């Protein structure tokens, strides 16, 4: 099956977590909004507006898989995980990696809020003072708590990945989190 990924063409954002899973698995997919002309962003906007679809997505990223349209990063990864060999096949295992991905989703919100603590509608420069305060608290309190949790998960797994010796979409998402932090906070991340 050829998957269609819909996400903004010029940023990695939440769509990158899905892209990494698709790429790692060697899945057949097209990044729709990166197409030119009407087949790109306008095609994505048509689905968002929902005139031709019974269950329209709210915002990107979303994935079209045959007749299904699946929104929300963690939900997309839950769907793709077993199909791409990036999640366990048993229910308990699938729910475990989904739980970890939802925890990553919480962390993504906190990371975003270091640059946009007041609102996403203002540029960073317009909320710089609040961003500095949010960043201070993020680094002092929130990020260490999340990192300790994922270190514990990895320690208990018995292998280099959250599932032990098998790579999962959560491992790819943790990679993306760390790379994103290195990009957004290069000086602070040198300490890690």
What spans do the regions from the language model cover?
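A short acidic/glycine-rich loop-to-helix N-cap element
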Residues: 130, 185-192
């Amino acid at each position: 099956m050829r998957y269609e990924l819909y996400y903004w063409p010029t940023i990695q954002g939440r769509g990158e977590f899905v892209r990494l899973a698709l790429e790692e698995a060697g899945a057949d997919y097209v990044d729709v909004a990166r197409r030119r002309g009407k087949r790109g962003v306008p095609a994505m906007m048509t689905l968002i507006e929902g005139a031709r679809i019974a269950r329209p997505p709210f915002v990107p990223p979303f994935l079209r898989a045959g007749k299904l349209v699946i929104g929300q990063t963690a939900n997309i990864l839950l769907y793709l995980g077993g199909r791409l060999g990036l999640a366990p096949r048993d229910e308990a295992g699938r729910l475990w990696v989904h739980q970890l991905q939802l925890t990553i989703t919480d962390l993504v919100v906190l990371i975003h809020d270091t640059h946009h603590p007041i609102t996403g509608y203002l540029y960073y420069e317009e909320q710089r003072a609040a961003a500095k305060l949010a960043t201070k608290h993020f680094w002092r309190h929130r990020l260490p708590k999340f990192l300790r949790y994922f270190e514990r998960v990895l320690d208990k797994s018995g292998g280099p990945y959250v599932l032990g010796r098998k790579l999962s979409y959560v491992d790819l998402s943790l990679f993306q989190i760390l790379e994103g932090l290195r990009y957004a906070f290069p000086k602070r991340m040198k300490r890690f």
